[in-house]
Swiss-Prot record:
Subcellular location: Secreted; Host nucleus; Host cytoplasm
Domain of life: Eukaryota
Species this chain originates from: Plasmopara viticola
One GO cellular component term: host cell cytoplasm
Stated role: Secreted effector that dos not suppress the host cell death induced by cell death-inducing proteins.
Family: Belongs to the RxLR effector family.
Signal peptide: 1-21
Name assigned to this protein: Secreted RxLR effector protein 105
Entry keyword set: Host cytoplasm, Host nucleus, Secreted, Signal, Virulence
Domain notes: The RxLR-dEER motif acts to carry the protein into the host cell cytoplasm through binding to cell surface phosphatidylinositol-3-phosphate.
Amino acid sequence: MRGPCSVITALLVVASSQIAAESDYRLQAYHHDVTAVGNAVVKPLPKRYLRGSQHVLDSNEERSVYSVLASMINEGVSKMPQAAEAVEKMPQAAEAVEKMPQAAEAVEKMPQAAEAVEKMPQAAEAVEKMPSAAMAGKKVSRVTKTGKKMPHAAEIEAVEETLHATNARKEPLRADFVEEMPHAAKAKEEMRRAKQHDLLRATEEADEALEKSWHSSEDTAAIGGASRGISSNVILSLKKWKNNFQGMRAMAVSGEHEDIIKPIHEAFVRLCGENMEPTTKEMTLIRNMLDWDVAASPESSHRQNLVSQAQRHVLIGLRIMQRDPEVWNEWNELSESLRFGVLDYLLNLHYQRWVRMYNIFKRHRPDKKDVPMNDKLSLGGNTDKNSALALQTHSKKQNLYPDEPSNVAWTSKKRDGSVLIERSKRTFNGNTDTASVPYKQLKMQSLKPVMPFLTRSTTSGHHSVSIKNPGLSFDGPIFAFVPPNVHKSQSLTPPLVHKDVDTELSLGGIYDRSTHKAPTVP
């Protein structure tokens, strides 16, 4: 019985393979292995039969056939898991076969090639204007997401709209259209590379312009010895942005210690000067940073947080500007290099302001000791050049805190438009630098209504940006300021309400409030 059973089993295996072949969805792995084993066995089979029959007639025939079938069955059993998995997928294959007529019908409804080619943009002209792929591949790197249309984006959108429009007409397929498809795909890939190349070139031009205009001051060397804070002689590159806003959630100021927080904030404002006007929340963030227990490198960690705060303010400024369609459209009409230049410069201005506030608070610690009056350190409201220079000279001679920064800002008028010229000398913690806006006129008339949106206070007050806004999500813990040595028996008071930098420009003396007024945001 073993012989017939083995033969029947082999026939069943062969029959199942033929059935799978008829459905045009063969069990490839199983069929391949069975075929290989069968070929290997059938080849030496005549020799085995003859060797067995030489000694005893018909003595080894049954055993030879059985051994061959047994090896085939064992090999098939080892492959059964793969076969079972393939069998499970057979219903899906049958369903796909049923949908083949629909696929064929969809192919017949594709647009005509002639009409699509007629409505395509001038591919040859676009390719001639695009840089070579090799140069683009070398220079393309990680670029910032700007959310605006790049060069040649209009052509790509026109192609897609043409395809959608012609696809709706359900016209038959043309052979020449199929031939043109690879060329269209290649042209689209070249356009994508051109966009990345143009974006990279614009950011590089913005970085070069900033490096030319942002020079360190070597004539006013270190004052007071070694540095005791974060150096301000640093240029942040727009290309190296890392949008990691962990811990950038809005800060909460405890209202139950108003009588303690208020004098600390007032003392800190006197130390910084009127033109910086740090808010209570900004002071809270700096105070909490100084109290963090960072074992490795606290200043490096603090610097990274100040960079993140500067990035956050730039993005919030863009978000506020986007709320006004007129201003946003005017902003998008500017060239990419000019837009990146403005964002790059604003990023460094915000960072400089945060570094100054951090170093001042770290040096004097108004939360832990009394701070003397510093009314002579007022740096705000100076629009006249002579008054600014006089203030600078006076501060050099009689400044109570010689390490404090002294800023001068004015606006000069020319026939072609308004050119903002800013000079700032910062001599705190032994680090000095001088920042000046490039003298090159970069369409400042167009930038005039845009700059207030980007430079206004975005930390608190009526014009703050909610963290629930999907465009700006800052995850992380909520900061809270609780002064030291506070008794639990102290009575609770209403939440602390403080005056922010309101709607006027205040970037550490970079823009003066009497020369530029920020428009009201609805």
